[in-house]
Protein backbone atom coordinates (compact mmCIF):
# COMPACT_ATOMS: atom_id res chain seq x y z
CA UNK A 1 0.00 0.00 0.00
CA UNK A 2 1.12 3.54 -0.61
CA UNK A 3 2.92 5.07 2.37
CA UNK A 4 0.67 8.12 2.10
CA UNK A 5 0.02 9.67 5.49
CA UNK A 6 0.82 6.44 7.36
CA UNK A 7 4.60 6.79 7.30
CA UNK A 8 6.66 9.89 8.03
CA UNK A 9 10.39 10.32 8.48
CA UNK A 10 10.11 10.06 12.27
CA UNK A 11 8.99 6.42 11.85
CA UNK A 12 12.43 5.42 10.55
CA UNK A 13 14.35 3.41 13.13
CA UNK A 14 17.93 4.34 13.90
CA UNK A 15 20.75 3.56 13.47
CA UNK A 16 19.99 3.73 9.74
CA UNK A 17 23.02 1.60 8.90
CA UNK A 18 21.20 -1.32 10.56
CA UNK A 19 17.65 -0.62 9.44
CA UNK A 20 18.02 0.28 5.76
CA UNK A 21 19.42 -1.62 2.79
CA UNK A 22 19.65 -1.01 -0.91
CA UNK A 23 18.97 -3.44 -3.72
CA UNK A 24 18.98 -3.24 -7.51
CA UNK A 25 22.41 -1.59 -7.74
CA UNK A 26 21.43 0.91 -5.08
CA UNK A 27 18.30 2.28 -6.73
CA UNK A 28 15.78 0.49 -4.49
CA UNK A 29 15.87 1.13 -0.75
CA UNK A 30 14.15 -0.95 1.93
CA UNK A 31 13.82 0.52 5.42
CA UNK A 32 12.34 -0.69 8.70
CA UNK A 33 9.80 1.67 10.25
CA UNK A 34 8.09 1.71 13.64
CA UNK A 35 4.53 3.05 13.54
CA UNK A 36 4.17 2.77 17.33
CA UNK A 37 1.03 0.63 17.33
CA UNK A 38 0.05 -1.98 18.08
CA UNK A 39 2.52 -2.19 20.95
CA UNK A 40 3.32 -5.85 20.27
CA UNK A 41 4.04 -5.48 16.59
CA UNK A 42 4.77 -1.94 15.43
CA UNK A 43 7.51 -2.74 12.89
CA UNK A 44 6.83 -2.66 9.15
CA UNK A 45 9.04 -2.11 6.17
CA UNK A 46 8.85 0.33 3.32
CA UNK A 47 10.18 0.04 -0.22
CA UNK A 48 11.37 3.27 -1.83
CA UNK A 49 11.80 3.62 -5.59
CA UNK A 50 13.33 6.55 -7.48
CA UNK A 51 10.99 9.12 -8.98
CA UNK A 52 9.12 7.92 -12.04
CA UNK A 53 8.00 9.94 -15.04
CA UNK A 54 4.93 11.14 -13.12
CA UNK A 55 6.77 12.87 -10.33
CA UNK A 56 7.93 12.11 -6.82
CA UNK A 57 9.57 9.14 -5.28
CA UNK A 58 7.44 6.03 -4.82
CA UNK A 59 6.99 4.66 -1.29
CA UNK A 60 5.21 1.38 -0.57
CA UNK A 61 4.39 0.24 2.97
CA UNK A 62 4.49 -3.51 3.58
CA UNK A 63 2.24 -4.43 6.50
CA UNK A 64 0.55 -7.57 7.77
CA UNK A 65 -2.91 -6.17 7.14
CA UNK A 66 -3.93 -3.48 4.67
CA UNK A 67 -7.05 -2.33 6.52
CA UNK A 68 -5.42 -1.64 9.87
CA UNK A 69 -1.69 -1.71 9.20
CA UNK A 70 -0.53 -4.18 11.83
CA UNK A 71 3.12 -5.06 11.62
CA UNK A 72 5.51 -7.46 13.27
CA UNK A 73 7.61 -7.54 16.42
CA UNK A 74 10.83 -7.65 14.39
CA UNK A 75 11.73 -7.17 10.73
CA UNK A 76 14.98 -9.01 9.93
CA UNK A 77 16.25 -6.68 7.23
CA UNK A 78 19.85 -7.85 7.69
CA UNK A 79 18.64 -11.31 6.53
CA UNK A 80 16.81 -10.02 3.43
CA UNK A 81 17.76 -11.41 0.02
CA UNK A 82 16.91 -10.49 -3.54
CA UNK A 83 16.75 -12.29 -6.86
CA UNK A 84 15.50 -11.70 -10.38
CA UNK A 85 12.59 -14.01 -11.27
CA UNK A 86 12.01 -15.18 -14.85
CA UNK A 87 9.07 -12.82 -15.38
CA UNK A 88 11.19 -9.75 -14.69
CA UNK A 89 11.48 -7.31 -11.86
CA UNK A 90 13.35 -7.73 -8.61
CA UNK A 91 12.01 -9.97 -5.86
CA UNK A 92 13.03 -8.94 -2.35
CA UNK A 93 12.38 -11.39 0.48
CA UNK A 94 12.40 -10.08 4.04
CA UNK A 95 11.96 -12.27 7.15
CA UNK A 96 9.56 -11.01 9.81
CA UNK A 97 8.89 -12.27 13.32
CA UNK A 98 5.73 -12.29 15.42
CA UNK A 99 5.22 -11.56 19.10
CA UNK A 100 5.90 -14.06 21.89
CA UNK A 101 3.63 -13.12 24.83
CA UNK A 102 5.69 -15.32 27.18
CA UNK A 103 8.85 -13.28 26.68
CA UNK A 104 7.45 -9.98 25.41
CA UNK A 105 9.88 -10.12 22.47
CA UNK A 106 10.05 -11.57 18.96
CA UNK A 107 9.38 -15.29 18.72
CA UNK A 108 12.23 -16.89 16.72
CA UNK A 109 9.91 -19.77 15.78
CA UNK A 110 7.39 -17.39 14.20
CA UNK A 111 9.59 -16.43 11.23
CA UNK A 112 7.74 -15.78 7.99
CA UNK A 113 9.33 -14.71 4.74
CA UNK A 114 7.55 -11.84 3.00
CA UNK A 115 8.40 -11.34 -0.68
CA UNK A 116 7.64 -8.31 -2.78
CA UNK A 117 8.14 -7.92 -6.52
CA UNK A 118 9.51 -4.54 -7.52
CA UNK A 119 9.08 -3.39 -11.10
CA UNK A 120 11.02 -0.18 -11.11
CA UNK A 121 10.12 0.88 -14.67
CA UNK A 122 6.40 0.49 -13.91
CA UNK A 123 6.76 2.00 -10.44
CA UNK A 124 5.07 -0.94 -8.73
CA UNK A 125 5.70 -2.93 -5.56
CA UNK A 126 3.50 -6.03 -5.22
CA UNK A 127 3.27 -8.63 -2.48
CA UNK A 128 4.04 -11.95 -4.17
CA UNK A 129 4.48 -14.42 -1.34
CA UNK A 130 4.42 -14.86 2.37
CA UNK A 131 5.06 -18.07 4.25
Where are these regions (language model features)?
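Exposed acidic/polar residues on beta-strands and adjacent loops within beta-sheet cores, strongest
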Residues: 1-131
